[in-house]
Amino acid sequence: MSNCFDTNILSSSHINFLFGAGVNGKAFPQLKSFTDTLSKIEELGGNIESGLESGIDSLSSSAHKKIVKDVFIKEFMEADAKMNEKFGKDMSLINLEKMLRKTYLLVNESQNRNPSMKQINIFTLNYDQIVEKTLSSLGYFFSEISASNTTTRAMLLDVIGYNFNVKKYVPTFMVSKLHGDIDNPIIPGKSKYQEMLNEDYFEIAFNMKEKLCRQNSILIVIGYSGRDEHINKILKDCLNAGLTIYWYKFAQMDIVPFEENTQIIVRQQEDYSNPQDTTANCYRDMEQVWEKKLEE
């Protein structure tokens, strides 16, 4: 499979990522694995035949949804605690680390005179702190914002690090948790679209749209199902404003909204019968770009 990145474009763009649950590979359980939450939905009269999200929607009582939310948070935190044992060992997490490290190197070495291009935005739909822990272990400068800290951290949305010793801006990651975090989550279910309109969440979503609509912006999509109506609306608006999207597919049946749009470059798997982590595929594509830069 040929590299989907153009070397010149990648080295002269605002680089942004959109991460869904699939970015963690097999390192973190998917919603279908939250058996305690699924059992509680059934116990309260919900229907889980179509999965956890539809099961939550099938609950008519807000009190029941609150009970399910509490069970979900407890189960999530238990899974998150086990995650700490996997750092440095799980191949999916290693692939994520390699991809973020290569992104840093590319941005650091790019000869962009625009300081804003030193900011790397990661918009994530996940509650976990895998990205933050990975960036911290790499020693990279980053900020994180979610609905639980918007009031105190909104001022960091445009912060970019500067090294006074060498008088140079340094790559800075901005992690925006679009569905909140485990302290203040938007739990799965159609009601999340209404919650996204709340002030705290709206500010994060608005910032995403603003960043993606900038000139010379690209978005690398990894692990996203393509089924979030609110996110898809943002992507559509940004495509109309000139955004280029690089979409990494894991499974052949993965949904890519607006796939007919020529501004969406879909990175297929080399072998769908043996799919590789999309973070690994992205890393390899970036590695090829890096090698070309070294040859220049």
Report each predicted region and the residues it spans:
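Metal-dependent phosphodiesterase/nuclease catalytic metal-binding core
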Residues: 196
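Conserved catalytic-core helix/loop/strand module for nucleotide-ribose chemistry
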Residues: 1-193, 201-206, 211, 218, ...
